[in-house]
UniProtKB/Swiss-Prot annotation:
<feature type="binding site">
    <location>
        <position position="87"/>
    </location>
    <ligand>
        <name>Zn(2+) 2</name>
    </ligand>
</feature>
<feature type="binding site">
    <location>
        <position position="54"/>
    </location>
    <ligand>
        <name>Zn(2+) 1</name>
    </ligand>
</feature>
<feature type="lipid moiety-binding region" description="S-diacylglycerol cysteine">
    <location>
        <position position="20"/>
    </location>
</feature>
<feature type="binding site">
    <location>
        <position position="164"/>
    </location>
    <ligand>
        <name>Zn(2+) 1</name>
    </ligand>
</feature>
<keyword id="KW-0862">Zinc</keyword>
<protein>
    <recommendedName>
        <fullName>CyanoP</fullName>
    </recommendedName>
</protein>
<dbReference type="InterPro" id="IPR016123">
    <property type="entry name" value="Mog1/PsbP_a/b/a-sand"/>
</dbReference>
<dbReference type="GO" id="GO:0019898">
    <property type="term" value="C:extrinsic component of membrane"/>
</dbReference>
<dbReference type="GO" id="GO:0015979">
    <property type="term" value="P:photosynthesis"/>
</dbReference>
<feature type="binding site">
    <location>
        <position position="58"/>
    </location>
    <ligand>
        <name>Zn(2+) 2</name>
    </ligand>
</feature>
<keyword id="KW-0472">Membrane</keyword>
<feature type="lipid moiety-binding region" description="N-palmitoyl cysteine">
    <location>
        <position position="20"/>
    </location>
</feature>
<keyword id="KW-0732">Signal</keyword>
<feature type="binding site">
    <location>
        <position position="163"/>
    </location>
    <ligand>
        <name>Zn(2+) 3</name>
    </ligand>
</feature>
<comment type="function">
    <text>Plays a role in the early stages of photosystem II (PSII) assembly; binds to D2 (psbD) and may facilitate its incorporation into PSII. Present in less than 1% of PSII preparations.</text>
</comment>
<feature type="binding site">
    <location>
        <position position="142"/>
    </location>
    <ligand>
        <name>Zn(2+) 3</name>
    </ligand>
</feature>
<feature type="binding site">
    <location>
        <position position="31"/>
    </location>
    <ligand>
        <name>Zn(2+) 1</name>
    </ligand>
</feature>
């Protein structure tokens, strides 16, 4: 009787502990054609997009929270390091893509780091973006991106949320970004 109680308690503990993993509540997205994969939250829905955006998922309740992957062909670039340091790539991304001067958006690079996984270099960028609007309607957003080069293409996975939601989603979004793999 006592053994059965401990066995049952242990089984319940293992099941509950498994739900506490960093990837709980996430599911895999695999694009074997373009050669990348990542985790995204269960219950998020895929949105129709146009090139160069390859895929977008967003929350069905907090629709402004999203994850996207952009794939661009790059002539003669064999490695991410050839594009510059993490800070240089981050500055160019913000200046030319995220918040070009004519867009009315502003941006600030918060952090830029480099990490290696499976012989690939990934630049991890954290940045803030202010969308246009007057003082009351301008929206502050918080973003994380992972950038990698593989097979003559630059892959950029980005997650984004309103700044006021960032503390709630930060850990999950960091897990999503770190799950991004190109091959």
């Amino acid at each position: 009787m006592l053994q059965r109680f401990f066995a049952t308690a242990l089984a319940i503990f293992v099941v509950l502990l498994g739900g506490c993993s960093a990837t709980s509540g996430l599911q895999a997205y695999v694009d074997s054609y373009d050669g990348y994969e990542f985790l995204y939250p269960r219950g998020w829905v895929q949105v129709q997009v146009e090139d160069p955006v390859d895929v977008v998922f967003h929350d069905i309740i907090e629709t402004t929270e999203n994850v996207s992957v952009v794939v661009n062909t790059v002539a003669s670039t064999k490695s991410l390091e050839e594009l510059g340091s993490p800070e240089e790539v981050g500055d160019r991304l913000l200046r030319n893509i995220i918040a070009p001067s004519e867009s009315g958006r502003s941006s600030a690079l918060i952090a830029a780091t480099s990490q290696k996984a499976d012989d690939k270099t990934y630049y991890i960028l954290e940045y803030a973006v202010t969308l246009p609007g007057d003082g009351n309607t301008a929206q502050q957003r918080h973003n994380l991106s992972s950038i990698a080069v593989s097979r003559g293409k630059v892959y950029t996975l980005s997650v984004s949320a309103p700044e006021e939601r960032w503390p709630k989603v930060e850990d999950q979004f960091k897990t999503i970004v770190s799950s991004f793999t190109v091959y």
